[in-house]
Amino acid sequence: MLHYSNCNKICEKTVMNQRTIKTAIAVTGTGLHSGQPVDLEFQPQPIDTGIVFERSDIVGSTPIPASAFLVQDTMMSSNLVFGGTRVGTVEHLLSAIAGLGVDNLLIRVSASEIPIMDGSAAPFVGLLLQAGLCEQDALKKFIRIVRTVRVKVDDKWAELRPYSGFELNFEIDFDHPAIDKDFQHAQLQFSTQNFIEQLSSARTFGFLRDIEAMRQNNLALGGSMDNAIVIDEANILNEEGLRFNDEFVRHKILDALGDLYLIGYPILGRFNAYKSGHALNNLLVREILSDHNNFEIVTFDDNVTCPIEYLPLNGITVEG
């Protein structure tokens, strides 16, 4: 479990520098679509490296930067392709990385997809914290939205607006008896603590009829109620039920946070979305980056002037 220090906020003035992990760490999970074991390893990286993926099962494979422009497939997940090499289902892991404020990291994976773990970002958060976070000798860079950008497809839309911090608002619209109409909108005022407590453990979800159809096409072979909320025509099938009343929409925010981190920096802006998904999230990021008048890259000399609250490196520990 995660344990917070008594100080809920950054209490002392400290430099707002880039972060990586202290030491390499590895885990094995299950591929959502293959159903096969997948080895995952995180390694520290130098300043200004960014987040980079590498296929450990392919000798001499080309490293894949975590870039919105390398997303070539958004069917049910965000998938990166570079130099003919693919790494899929990256959004939950990227959400954890964004939530902890990690700037530089090498992710080595032994298959074409990141393991699904429990269907949320929480296992990745725990793993990164076990490795330990450390600050580096360079200021952390942020992308500040200076002009509202909106993308729309049919009735679905997503936008980023200028805002002093980072806020995410999301609304879904499911006409299903198991998805309460009163819990289809959620908001997150981003901070590391809010991310861990309110968002990181929200699981992905799927409808039983869709899962059965995918399995007929050799997809979702690793999917189960251990790593997803499964819904039939009327009910949630997981015996333990939901972790939050609004877990469905919280997970959509979790996905969006990971998709948005493909912009390359932590965001200063307000994200609003209605029925958005991986494709629209990616389109939004590309649209923002297409015009330098939409944004500016900024740094902060200290955490007091930085409008985003990251917990200090000693503010979270892993127990058990």
Curated annotation (Swiss-Prot):
Its cofactor is Zn(2+). The keyword Zinc applies. Pfam families: LpxC. One of its GO terms (cellular component) is membrane. Signal peptide: none annotated. The active site is at H278. It catalyses: a UDP-3-O-[(3R)-3-hydroxyacyl]-N-acetyl-alpha-D-glucosamine + H2O = a UDP-3-O-[(3R)-3-hydroxyacyl]-alpha-D-glucosamine + acetate. Keywords: Hydrolase, Lipid A biosynthesis, Lipid biosynthesis, Lipid metabolism, Metal-binding, Zinc. InterPro entries: Ribosomal_Su5_D2-typ_SF, UDP-acyl_GlcNac_deAcase, UDP-acyl_GlcNac_deAcase_C, UDP-acyl_N-AcGlcN_deAcase_N. Pathway: Glycolipid biosynthesis; lipid IV(A) biosynthesis; lipid IV(A) from (3R)-3-hydroxytetradecanoyl-[acyl-carrier-protein] and UDP-N-acetyl-alpha-D-glucosamine: step 2/6. The keyword Chloroplast does not apply. One of its GO terms (biological process) is lipid A biosynthetic process. Zn(2+) binds at H92, H251, D255. One of its GO terms (molecular function) is metal ion binding. Its EC number is 3.5.1.108. Catalyzes the hydrolysis of UDP-3-O-myristoyl-N-acetylglucosamine to form UDP-3-O-myristoylglucosamine and acetate, the committed step in lipid A biosynthesis. PANTHER family: UDP-3-O-ACYL-N-ACETYLGLUCOSAMINE DEACETYLASE 1, MITOCHONDRIAL-RELATED (PTHR33694:SF1). Belongs to the LpxC family. This is UDP-3-O-acyl-N-acetylglucosamine deacetylase.
